[in-house]
């Protein structure tokens, strides 16, 4: 029996599965075959929810006596766009000059391929693992993230599963393998403000109520002053206005409605609830500011809606998990990785409620881009890091 010890072969098999979210595309099946070669038992639960596609997931475990390590990630990928723009077909896993091209090469089929190879090498060298390893893999990370990791964790917990630590194989390194381990993430909160006015002719503003004046005032209150100056482990919270819309194609008509959407990435100064309260307080004060609405005595009429559920800020403090991974990275790459909380959200935000979690994978420079690609040397390097981590984690 040949174990899946080669990360290049593993990744090629996964890339050739067109698992554009929410499609499974054969990727979970390919992964399950690799894991069963190593004696893993596997389940493929499908989860559903209103107004979202059904999603197939995979939970596989190889049990032993000792701590339980979870590797988590996703096999779904973003669409490739126009395939004619690619140097190599996005689902062909072609190699040129020591580089493999394909959608998901770094985000994050590459990380999965390397961890599979690392486990296989450990088993080949040492036999059984001194503990348990599980793979918690979803097909719903690039999509709404409703029927994926969050439900798979609860499904596993209800069946008696518990974990001592988790690694998420997202591409954490900005420039080169070994740059960065993510030990936490900022929270994320999104909302939409709607201001209602009265439509009218631009030449007769006294007969109308321009909602643009109101939306500008409200948005300004969220942009200044700054929410905070950052903390010891997190950069300053940052709010970005992502859309301002009036739906008006005529230049001589005052619109009857204006909307603005925003997203804020926040640090551990705030909880989602305290941040929502701060935003509401700012908007309420600004609604009474009529400097841009001369002659108007009534407050700005607006509605605030929160979009999707917020993700909460977290920071992992587990010394064994972080220390062992840091030492493994340094041993293979020769450099000490930065411990960071930068970047966007990931499914680690769900895992943190079940066990300590960190993120470490490949270099993310080409994720979601045309010609997404990974150096074969990085696949081997990451596999060696994971293999060393597994050996040291289980002692």
UniProtKB/Swiss-Prot annotation:
Query: Which purpose does this protein serve, as stated in its record?
Result: Catalyzes the hydrolysis of N-succinyl-L,L-diaminopimelic acid (SDAP), forming succinate and LL-2,6-diaminopimelate (DAP), an intermediate involved in the bacterial biosynthesis of lysine and meso-diaminopimelic acid, an essential component of bacterial cell walls.
**GO MF annotation terms:** acetylornithine deacetylase activity; cobalt ion binding; succinyl-diaminopimelate desuccinylase activity; zinc ion binding
The UniProt annotation places Zn(2+) 1 binding at 74, 107, 170
Q: Which InterPro entries match?
A: ArgE/DapE_CS (IPR001261), Bact_exopeptidase_dim_dom (IPR036264), DapE_proteobac (IPR005941), Peptidase_M20 (IPR002933), Peptidase_M20_dimer (IPR011650), Peptidase_M20A (IPR050072)
Give its E.C. classification number.
Answer: 3.5.1.18
Q: Which UniProt keywords apply?
A: Amino-acid biosynthesis, Cobalt, Diaminopimelate biosynthesis, Hydrolase, Lysine biosynthesis, Metal-binding, Zinc
Cofactor(s) listed? Zn(2+); Co(2+)
Ranges in a coiled coil: none
The free-text note explaining how the cofactor binds reads:
Binds 2 Zn(2+) or Co(2+) ions per subunit.
Catalytic activity annotated for this protein? N-succinyl-(2S,6S)-2,6-diaminopimelate + H2O = (2S,6S)-2,6-diaminopimelate + succinate
What this protein is called in its record is Succinyl-diaminopimelate desuccinylase
Cystine connections: none
Query: Family assignment?
Result: Belongs to the peptidase M20A family. DapE subfamily.
Q: Name one GO biological process term.
A: diaminopimelate biosynthetic process
Known PROSITE patterns for this protein?
A: ARGE_DAPE_CPG2_1, ARGE_DAPE_CPG2_2
Query: How would you summarize the oligomeric state and partners of this protein?
Result: Homodimer.
Sites where the protein binds Zn(2+) 2: 107, 142, 368
Domain of life of the organism in this record?
Answer: Bacteria
Catalytic residues, chain numbering: 76, 141
């Amino acid at each position: 029996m040949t174990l899946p010890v080669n990360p290049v072969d593993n990744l090629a098999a996964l890339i050739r599965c067109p698992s554009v979210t929410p499609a499974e595309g054969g990727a979970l099946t390919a992964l399950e075959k690799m894991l069963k070669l190593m004696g893993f038992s596997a389940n493929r639960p499908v989860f559903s929810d209103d107004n979202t596609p059904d999603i197939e997931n995979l939970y596989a475990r190889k049990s032993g006596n000792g701590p339980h390590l979870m590797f988590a990630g996703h096999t779904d990928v973003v669409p490739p766009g126009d395939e004619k723009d690619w140097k190599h077909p996005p689902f062909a896993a072609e190699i040129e000059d020591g580089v493999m091209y394909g959608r998901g090469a770094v985000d994050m089929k590459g990380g999965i391929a390397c961890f599979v190879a690392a486990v296989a090498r450990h088993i080949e060298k040492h036999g059984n693992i001194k503990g348990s390893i599980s793979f918690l893999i979803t097909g719903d990370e690039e999509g709404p993230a409703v029927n994926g990791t969050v439900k798979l964790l609860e499904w596993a917990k209800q069946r008696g599963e518990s974990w001592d630590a988790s690694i998420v194989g997202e591409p954490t390194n900005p420039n080169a393998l070994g740059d960065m381990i993510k030990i936490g993430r900022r929270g994320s909160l999104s909302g939409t403000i709607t201001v209602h006015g009265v439509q009218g002719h631009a030449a007769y503003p006294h007969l109308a109520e321009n909602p643009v004046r109101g939306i500008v005032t409200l948005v300004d209150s969220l942009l200044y002053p700054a929410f905070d100056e950052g903390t010891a482990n997190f950069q300053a919270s940052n709010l970005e206005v992502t859309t301002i819309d009036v739906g008006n194609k005529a230049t001589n008509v005052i619109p009857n409605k204006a909307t603005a959407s925003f997203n804020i990435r926040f640090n551990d100064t705030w909880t989602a609830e305290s941040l929502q309260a701060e935003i509401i307080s700012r908007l309420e004060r600004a609604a009474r500011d009529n400097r841009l609405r001369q002659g108007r005595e009534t407050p700005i009429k607006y509605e605030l809606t929160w979009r999707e559920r917020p993700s909460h800020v977290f920071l992992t403090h587990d010394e064994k998990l972080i220390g062992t991974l840091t030492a493994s990275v340094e041993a293979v790459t020769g450099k000490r990785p930065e411990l960071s909380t930068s970047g966007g959200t990931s499914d680690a935000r769900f895992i943190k409620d079940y066990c300590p979690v960190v993120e470490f994978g490949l270099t993310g420079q080409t994720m979601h881009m045309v010609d997404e690609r990974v150096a074969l040397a990085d696949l081997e390097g990451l596999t060696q890091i994971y293999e060393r981590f597994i050996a040291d984690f289980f002692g």
